[in-house]
Amino acid sequence: MEPIPINAPDSVRNLKLLQWVRETAELCQPDSVCWCDGSVEEYDRLCNEMVASGTFIKLSEQKRPNSYLCRSDPSDVARVEDRTFICSIRRQDAGPTNNWVAPKEMKATLNKLLAGCMKGRTMYIIPFSMGPLGSHIAHIGVEITDSPYVVTNMRIMTRMGRAVLDLLDEEAEFVPCLHSVGAPLEPGQQDVPWPCNDTKYIVHFPEERSIVSYGSGYGGNALLGKKCFALRIASSMARDEGWLAEHMLILGVESPEGEKDYVAAAFPSACGKTNFAMMIPPGEMEGWKITTVGDDIAWIKQGKDGRLYAINPEYGFFGVAPGTSEKSNPNAMATLHANCIFTNVALTPDGDVWWEGMTDTPPDFLIDWQGKPWVPGCERPAAHPNARFTAPAHQCPVIDENWENPDGVPISAFIFGGRRGDTIPLVYQSANWYYGVYLAATMGSEKTAAAAGKIGDVRRDPFAMLPFCGYHMGDYFNHWLHVGRTLTDPPRIFGVNWFRKDENGKFLWPGFGENMRVLKWIIGRVHGRAAAVESPLGWMPRYESLDWRGLDGFTRDKFSTLMSVDREAWKQELFSHEELLEKLYDRLPKEFTHIRELMLSTLWRSPEHWELAPERYTAEH
């Protein structure tokens, strides 16, 4: 059999890359090989080819210029955590929160599946940079794929193409990412709009710094720069090299006086991360501005001044569409005006898109995400609950001026929070870095109707990284503690909970843009200006410490309820941490045991129901 020509451009100098491409072509047997240059012409050509093949639908140029709708196979609509593997050399290094198979065994399985898997298809080679080109915080990857959907989405989500190849000299390191939909075509066989395979594997080899994904064309499983590289592999790199790869938004906060701070925040899914990253402050808080650096992932390295600096390694937003509206996130809606790819949303008769929550009243008629006619009241969603938009980040009207700064932005505070209807107060500042790491390690959200288990049960999601940490979670906690010890000026750590409810099940806090009031207090604490009260959990704002302009109906009593600490509920909360901590026991930081005991001791000494009012239990700072 003749070797498949790889047609490498003359500019490709990296010997490891050339060897890997040759080996992959021999294994996967594509009909042709295409080196992606990242040009507009290439993007337009691939989009037009997918329109012709039925994969893409061109949206109205008047309503949504240069944008496309794609419908996936109904079996391929989300990340598949049960088919996601961390194949470290030693099982114990993957830890109990990850699926593990021995690397040798997994490679044998994958090689059988990959043999001939690209027959009848084009093999695309996508050189991409996670982070601004040339940044000391950035890292380069190369994805090989047989999916033009992946190529077009990667052009929006990463800096990709010829400029990245130019950075890869003979010896430069890169992360190899191999992806196939696992649907070879025999000569003359008709393709389907969304090829995929029932057998799926998303596999990470942390010591080799490599990724293989087979069988799925969906975003998180196929856009390998995102969760696979930017979190699972990068978190393993970060542990070895002394930095942090985190599932965090990054935003800028500017005061009326022009003082600028940057904050990174981690929330589990369905807790409003993108909304927070693009928040619009209440009109009464004139002069305060929020800018967006990133909405999903942060790579954070130490600067020469002993502070932490973060970049958003991505170049676009891959957001959940349902629930996004002019009311909940007007900046996201403005970002979606053009040049986007929409996956599994509904199509309107006039060639635009729609999803649940976009408007109060749905249109009279739609074509749903499966291509079927849809009318209001037909008892099925028009858009899939995990429908997505892929949008260029530079289109965001509040994108931060430093979002592409190769040195990153200095982080003043970390914020952690889950969705909790009781127990957890609106906001509190941890006593120190160690308490803050414990706070983040034990955070969680109540299970919703969509998740297995009893509604109201708390699913622990440490640092919002449970599905994304590429090594043992106990080692991850230790790594955070170690990073804190090396900093001369560490960010302050805060816990928040926008979702506490009253006795009638109604949210106590209005959320959305009103969260700016809490953020203003956090920034005040960072600079030592805002007053706080010592509580059993850490430092909390007094009623007078928050800016209430424009929220006149929010009474002192309501705020007191929102901030209260119930001794019995918190004892149960601390005892409930045991399930997660026991699972990680052999590698759990010893500090955690002491912190838990100290918190219990503080609770024993506090009143049965701690509130902000009683002066004898408070100390102003």
From Swiss-Prot:
Disulfide bonds: none annotated. Substrate binds at residues 79, 218-220, 269, 386-388. The keyword rRNA-binding does not apply. Its cofactor is Mn(2+). GO terms for cellular component: cytosol. GTP binds at residues 270-275, 388, 419, 512-515. InterPro entries: PEP_carboxykin_GTP_CS (IPR018091), PEP_carboxykinase_C (IPR013035), PEP_carboxykinase_GTP (IPR008209), PEP_carboxykinase_GTP_C (IPR035077), PEP_carboxykinase_GTP_N (IPR035078), PEP_carboxykinase_N (IPR008210). It catalyses: oxaloacetate + GTP = phosphoenolpyruvate + GDP + CO2. It comes from the Bacteria. The active site is at residue 271. Keywords: Cytoplasm, Decarboxylase, Gluconeogenesis, GTP-binding, Lyase, Manganese, Metal-binding, Nucleotide-binding. CDD domains: PEPCK_GTP (cd00819). GO terms for molecular function: GTP binding; manganese ion binding; phosphoenolpyruvate carboxykinase (GTP) activity. Pfam families: PEPCK_GTP, PEPCK_N. Mn(2+) binds at residues 227, 247, 296. Binds 1 Mn(2+) ion per subunit. Pathway: Carbohydrate biosynthesis; gluconeogenesis. The keyword Metal-binding applies. GO terms for biological process: cellular response to glucose stimulus; gluconeogenesis; glycerol biosynthetic process from pyruvate; oxaloacetate metabolic process; propionate catabolic process; response to lipid; response to starvation. Monomer. Belongs to the phosphoenolpyruvate carboxykinase [GTP] family. This is Phosphoenolpyruvate carboxykinase [GTP].
